[in-house]
Amino acid sequence: MPVSGEAFLGLLPELVATGFLLVVLLGGVFAGPRSEALVAALAGLGTLASFAAAAGLLAAGFSGTFFGGGYAVDPFALYFKLIITATAFFTVIAAARWAERTGDAPEYMTLIIAVALGGMLLVSMRDLFGVFLAVELATIPSYAMVAFDRRRRESAEGGMKYLITGVIASSFLLYGIVLIYGVSGSANLSRVAEAFGEGLSPVAIVGLVLMISGLAFKVSAAPFHFWTPDAYQGAPTSAAAFLSVAPKAAIFAALLRILLDGMPQAAPTWTALMAVIAIVTMFVGNLLALRQSNVRRMLAYSSVAHSGYILAAFAALQGDAVSSGVQAVMIYSAAYAVMNLGAFLTIDLVGEEAKSFNGLFATRPMLAAAMAVFMAALVGIPPLSGFFGKAWVIYAGAGSGSALVYVAVAALVVNSVLSVPYYFGIIRNMFQEEPVSAGGPAKKGDGGVAFTVYAMALLTALFFLGVGPLAALAAGSGLL
């Protein structure tokens, strides 16, 4: 099949990322031991160039389906590519000094770009086997990122647990895809939708459940969440921050495309399943987060709960609420990316234990203010980014007309209240407790981490200024 120039143009963000991935990897080999700073700069340039390519295509109104309908470049995909490349860029900035000190900048930066590349491919896939390959491209480097810090035993343990559960999840996903392919006779989402025009057979339902289960592993949805705290605690802080947002955004985008493009007739089945998973995930994440004194593990369980909030929007994808449900997923993904990336990276500047934040306002007031913004946003306090994500989910759920979705929305409200003690506990420690030492916090970070934290705090606080354009973009995403 000949590849048109238009297809190459649509693939520009991925091609740019691939080119820089090779340059970064080979740069570490040929430039010698003093290439760490150069490699980090090239990685930052590559992720920024991919972001610019995606932004240019979006601004130009580019849209098309290529490779036999198996790959779509539309506003929906480009929106998520912007999230993925932006988080990759800021992760490179935050990780640069650490990677230079360890002498592993080429390898670490290559992994960041590889995860971003897999995510970009994933959000455009309209072929189920392509989805599987893109998921693997995004997750295999993730295993290495979690286990990357060879000096810490927890890193190896977290990486091993992540690898084992990831392999199980991939098996579920692939088996589900094979069942769907066997029943429908195609892996292309358009043809799958045609084959299931009159509803899903029992075998197809099993395949659907297995696919959703496999992807639920990847986004830390309960009961498939158990790898998350150990992986995030063991990973380098920049890796935990990046993996908590970028791959998850890509998985949510892929799941939206699979369900709405490939199985719209089965919406009553998968929306009910999503509602149940969402409710369980919210409660599991928040109840376990309440028990944590380690802030990194607390944020890991918090990420489980937020996956539940986003899955509640999936449950609302029925009736007149489909459009608002898609908007909710898209807006929440952007909102969560900025506030969670910043919250995780703040740990690098302060410390992992809750007591490390004691008296932070007295010693580093700007950093304390930034962390307070992140914690309040994760609760959903207006007008911060998290509020708009949750508000859109509630709005979509209210318009769904489903009693089960109403329960999921009520669970979201209850769990938001349930999360207040552990988020605001950090704020209380920073503003009311005595500093951990006379000299200030126990740990200081570098300029790249601080820059990223303050940038994310600013984006979190000013998110309301971009909600209108984001909502308009989501409404015209081209998915529906």
Swiss-Prot record:
Swiss-Prot/TrEMBL catalytic activity: a quinone + NADH + 5 H(+)(in) = a quinol + NAD(+) + 4 H(+)(out)
Spans traversing the lipid bilayer: 11-31, 38-58, 76-96, 105-125, 128-148, 163-183, 195-215, 240-260, 270-290, 298-318, 329-349, 368-388, 407-427, 453-473
Annotated EC: 7.1.1.-
Keywords: Cell membrane, Membrane, NAD, Quinone, Translocase, Transmembrane, Transmembrane helix, Transport
Top enzyme category: translocase
Gene Ontology cellular component annotations, sorted alphabetically: plasma membrane
Domain of life: Bacteria
Membrane topology: Multi-pass membrane protein
Gene Ontology terms for molecular function: NADH dehydrogenase (ubiquinone) activity; NADH:ubiquinone reductase (non-electrogenic) activity; quinone binding
Pfam families per UniProt: Proton_antipo_M
InterPro entries: NADH-Q_OxRdtase_suN/2 (IPR010096), ND/Mrp_TM (IPR001750)
Keyword Glycoprotein: no
One biological process term in Gene Ontology: ATP synthesis coupled electron transport
Subunit field text: NDH-1 is composed of 14 different subunits. Subunits NuoA, H, J, K, L, M, N constitute the membrane sector of the complex.
Family statement: Belongs to the complex I subunit 2 family.
Classification via NCBIfam families: NDH_I_N
Function: NDH-1 shuttles electrons from NADH, via FMN and iron-sulfur (Fe-S) centers, to quinones in the respiratory chain. The immediate electron acceptor for the enzyme in this species is believed to be a menaquinone. Couples the redox reaction to proton translocation (for every two electrons transferred, four hydrogen ions are translocated across the cytoplasmic membrane), and thus conserves the redox energy in a proton gradient.
This protein's name: NADH-quinone oxidoreductase subunit N
Organism: Rubrobacter xylanophilus (strain DSM 9941 / JCM 11954 / NBRC 16129 / PRD-1)
Taxonomic lineage from the root: Bacteria, Bacillati, Actinomycetota, Rubrobacteria, Rubrobacterales
